[in-house]
Curated annotation (Swiss-Prot):
Pathway: Cofactor biosynthesis; biotin biosynthesis; biotin from 7,8-diaminononanoate: step 1/2
Active site: K37
GN (gene name): bioD
Protein name: ATP-dependent dethiobiotin synthetase BioD
Cellular component GO terms, alphabetical: cytosol
Length: 220
């Protein structure tokens, strides 16, 4: 049915929590959803982003490749002496999960230009699959520049950006965070699909899923 990529303006902006929230909201709408993490780095077995998504959303996910060190995937593969991922393999594995009645949510590693392999980024994979992107961004100082650069990079690569999700929003936002909501949509020329509260990842699954339904506008 649809393949949707989720990336961020950087590390620790709330990308995994946003992926779990999207999975929950799509599932609540009645869609079949499968979250995918093509490359995981720096987590022991039994832990990692896809496990967080599964715990919060209650939806089983898939992880393709894992490297031991907490580095960009190409560096982690090189340091471990393991093969780097390739565009043909990633595209095939993601296509194999796609089905007419299913939404495949593909969570990247770090930002849009983080190298999955020496000459491969998440944007390359999205472009190969002709799949759109949702960008997760911080909301405080520095967010505007990072978000606009990320959206520009996606568009240059031929990847459509369907919208932004604000991650880890403070319960007591400062002036910059308050004003950046509107400014992000203006400069990036895409809608703000929702804002997820700080600490959302600590919620119990039922509470998390209710939060996701109330906080997000689905992009598809």
């Amino acid at each position: 049915m649809s393949i949707l990529f989720i990336s961020g303006t950087g590390t620790d902006v709330g990308k995994t929590i946003a992926t779990a929230a999207l999975a929950s909201a799509f599932h609540h709408r009645g869609d079949r959803v499968i979250p995918v993490k093509p490359v995981q780095t720096g987590e022991p077995d039994g832990r990692g982003d896809i496990h967080t998504v599964e715990k919060l959303s209650g939806i089983r996910g898939v992880e393709f490749t894992r490297y031991p060190d907490p580095l960009a995937p190409n560096l982690a593969a090189r340091r471990a002496g393991l093969p780097q991922v390739t565009l043909p393999d990633l595209a095939r594995e993601i296509r194999d999960l796609d089905a007419p009645d299913r939404i495949v949510l593909v969570e990247g590693a770090g930002g849009v230009l983080v190298r999955l392999a020496d000459d491969l980024t998440l944007l390359d994979v999205a472009a190969e699959l002709d799949a759109p992107l949702v960008l997760v961004t911080s909301l405080g100082l520095g967010s505007l520049n990072a978000a606009e650069l990320s959206v520009q990079a996606a568009r240059t690569a031929g990847v459509e950006v369907l919208g932004l999700i604000g991650g880890s929003a403070s319960p007591d936002p400062g002036l910059a965070e308050q004003l950046n909501h509107g400014e992000l949509t203006r400069i990036c020329r895409v809608p703000l699909l929702g804002v997820l509260p700080a600490g959302a990842g600590d919620l119990l699954p039922d509470d998390f899923q209710a939060m996701a339904q109330s906080c997000l506008t689905l992009p598809l």
